Amino acid sequence: DMPWGTSIKTPDELPTPPRTTWMGYRNKVGPAGTRNLLGIVTTVQCAAGVVKVAVERIKKELLPKYPNVDGVVAITHPYGCGVAINAPLAYIPIRAITNVIRHPNFGGEIMVVGLGCEKLTYDRVLPPEDITPENCLTLQDWEGHDAMMQAILDMAEKKLQKLNLRRREELPLSELLIGMQCG
């Protein structure tokens, strides 16, 4: 028999890592980001198509003007108007959407797009102080696809201007939050 666990080092015996800092984006609230992104989150799958088209236009027409922004991403989900929003397990997707809005790589810039008739309303994913015209856009408030698209582009431009001011800085490893997906 070979003994097991005989060479385990206790934490006080671990060597100092060769690197104790990393270059990241400090946020006013929450953990630091590893990238500088504009994230556009939808409240309903019905808004996903418009948002995905808008993201492609933002990448082509706006992003080149903002060299300090790494990219633009659409965060969509499959939940529609018929979702049982008050079901016992509905808190799981609501919590996921709420948390992704606050992703460290988004630099605190909130951009949520809804259709206007969905059950998953802004107040279910944002605190009251963040439900503003600067952060939330309702597609049904605009007449036609072109107006919707322009409204998204205008909001995105304002967010990109703010994100473009962010710079990487040297941060301690203790400020690096790593998420893992297992299984």
List each language-model region with its residue ranges:
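Metallocofactor- and cofactor-centric catalytic cores in central/energy metabolism, strongly enriched
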Residues: 1-182
